[in-house]
């Protein structure tokens, strides 16, 4: 029996997000490498992205912790680093690992698979989050406030307990979470600079009605989240004019100065058009001017990019 279509689509979406398959479904070179590892694609992704001995060892410990049941109390913090440090501390003492024994056995299997060394040092502060962001790119989270509420890169909302130290971090990488409530049970802080390699660059030149002018930013995005935004340099005049023209039908009444003088001229031309249709006079109503801004704005706008500058355009001359 074939699996449900929804499950197939979800699996395809995951594999594409991990770079394992192309948009049309063909396997990538990275996907072939992932397929050689006998583990979940997320874990395979994490093991392959761990490109230093220290990260490789850490990835095997994270994989083991995620595969087994959380050995720490439910009321403990959600920081995965706490579990990694506890595992390494128990392993470093040798002898009876007690509740960590099963997890260490799994970690040893992953070390063998990844040809990684045993490492009991405390990892770098953001190393755990870096690896989680590779395995769970759709669960990269940015704080909405300072009280534990986050937005995920996939657009969903998530949260950690406001008393959890994790809530003080602007960026988190989630691992284990409740998809219904959005609660993150295991996560780790991540340095946004570490995410730049998996971010996509977008140049956005658009009219910002709130600030009354053009916004021209080059953004680094992960899903719906913005990592950084910098002003776009160079000659962007053509794009600026297009953005103004695109906004004119909706916001034009506040962008341009439709003075009484302009209104009087529009009415006179409208009357002349109705009395003498043979003149075939153009429609110079507000709606027509704004809908057809691309026809006249380039000749009159100069370098205007704000409401104050656009309102200096003499619409009587335009008409």
Language-model-detected regions and their locations in the chain:
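Nucleic acid-processing catalytic cores of prokaryotic defense/repair systems
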Residues: 132, 137, 154-156, 160-162
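Acidic, serine/threonine- and proline-rich low-complexity intrinsically disordered segments
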Residues: 55-149, 170-319
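C-terminal helicase lobe
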Residues: 1-18
């Amino acid at each position: 029996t074939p699996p449900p279509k929804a499950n197939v689509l979800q699996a395809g979406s995951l594999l594409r997000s991990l770079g394992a398959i192309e948009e049309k479904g063909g396997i990538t070179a990275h996907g072939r490498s992932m397929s050689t590892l006998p583990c979940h694609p997320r874990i395979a992704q994490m093991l392959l992205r761990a490109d230093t001995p220290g990260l490789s060892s850490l990835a095997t410990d994270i994989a083991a912790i995620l595969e087994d049941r959380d050995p720490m109390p439910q009321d403990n913090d959600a920081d995965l680093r706490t579990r990694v440090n506890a595992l390494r501390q128990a392993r470093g003492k040798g002898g009876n690992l007690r509740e960590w024994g099963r997890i260490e056995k799994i970690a040893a299997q992953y070390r063998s698979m990844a040809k990684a060394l045993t490492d009991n040092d405390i990892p770098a502060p953001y190393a755990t989050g870096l690896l989680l962001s590779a395995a769970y790119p759709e669960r990269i989270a940015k704080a909405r406030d300072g009280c534990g509420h986050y937005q995920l890169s996939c657009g969903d909302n998530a949260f950690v307990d406001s008393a959890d130290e994790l809530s003080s971090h602007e960026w988190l990488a989630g691992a284990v979470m409740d998809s219904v409530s959005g609660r993150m049970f295991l996560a780790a802080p991540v340095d946004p600079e570490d995410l730049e390699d998996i971010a996509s660059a977008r140049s956005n030149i658009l009219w910002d009605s709130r600030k009354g002018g053009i916004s021209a930013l080059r953004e680094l995005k992960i899903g719906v989240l913005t990592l950084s935004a910098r002003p776009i340099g160079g000659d962007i005049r053509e794009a600026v004019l297009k953005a103004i023209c695109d906004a004119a039908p909706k916001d034009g009444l506040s962008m341009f100065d439709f003075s009484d003088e302009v209104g009087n001229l529009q009415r006179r031309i409208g009357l002349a058009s109705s009395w003498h249709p043979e003149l075939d006079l153009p429609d110079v109503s507000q709606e027509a001017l704004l809908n057809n801004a691309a026809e006249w704005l380039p000749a009159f706008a100069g370098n205007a990019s704000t409401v104050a500058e656009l309102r200096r355009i003499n619409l009587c001359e335009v008409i």
